[in-house]
Amino acid sequence: MVENEKTSVEETEEKAETEDEMLTEDPSNEDSDEANEEGNELSEEEKRIAELEGQVDELNQRLLRIQADYDNFRRRQREEKEAAAKYRAQSLIEELLPALDNFERALLVEPEQEETKTLLKGMEMVYRQVSEALKKEGLEVIETKGETFDPHLHQAVMQVEDAEFESNEIVEELQKGYKLKDRVIRPSMVKVNA
């Protein structure tokens, strides 16, 4: 029995030695350890690459936003510059409109004397010159005769009921209105049919 116990202990020891030898001699075990280390290194490198790619994408998005902002800024600057050039004479024209109105009122007077007729002709020539110069700058008279009332172009100061005119039609112009290019600088004061 002692002999049987010996053999089973010996067998167990032999098995353990063989397993140890197999473990130390098995190159696949060493490779798997190295592979695990390399896998860890690769996964860390892959994480770093993914992180850097994310940063690159974020920077590209920021760059695109900055470029879009800059393009919008340049467009606004250009539009403001064009508008300033387009309407540069607006304040001067607005100051001249009352004088132009007075010229028109003076030209409506019927002269009684020859001297007054000559003076009136001279005033008419000056009025035409000033009107032409303002037209070249883009000043236009807002038409009212036979037009339908438009609150963007006209200012209704009186309302009448007249069967000869359609509803909302302008009956009479009380003061001329003007546009500078496409901008209304003074609406026409009108009498409108109800």
From Swiss-Prot:
Coiled coil: none annotated. Keywords: Chaperone, Cytoplasm, Stress response. The keyword S-adenosyl-L-methionine does not apply. Its main location: cytoplasm. Residues 1-53 are annotated as: Disordered. It is found in: Cytoplasm. InterPro entries: GrpE (IPR000740), GrpE_coiled_coil (IPR013805), GrpE_head (IPR009012). GO terms for molecular function: adenyl-nucleotide exchange factor activity; protein homodimerization activity; protein-folding chaperone binding; unfolded protein binding. The keyword Cell membrane does not apply. Pfam families: GrpE. One of its GO terms (biological process) is protein folding. GO terms for cellular component: cytoplasm. Residues 10-44 have a biased composition (Acidic residues). Gene3D superfamilies: 3.90.20.20, Head domain of nucleotide exchange factor GrpE. Homodimer. Participates actively in the response to hyperosmotic and heat shock by preventing the aggregation of stress-denatured proteins, in association with DnaK and GrpE. It is the nucleotide exchange factor for DnaK and may function as a thermosensor. Unfolded proteins bind initially to DnaJ; upon interaction with the DnaJ-bound protein, DnaK hydrolyzes its bound ATP, resulting in the formation of a stable complex. GrpE releases ADP from DnaK; ATP binding to DnaK triggers the release of the substrate protein, thus completing the reaction cycle. HAMAP family: GrpE. Belongs to the GrpE family. This is Protein GrpE. It comes from Halalkalibacterium halodurans (strain ATCC BAA-125 / DSM 18197 / FERM 7344 / JCM 9153 / C-125) (Bacillus halodurans). The gene is grpE.
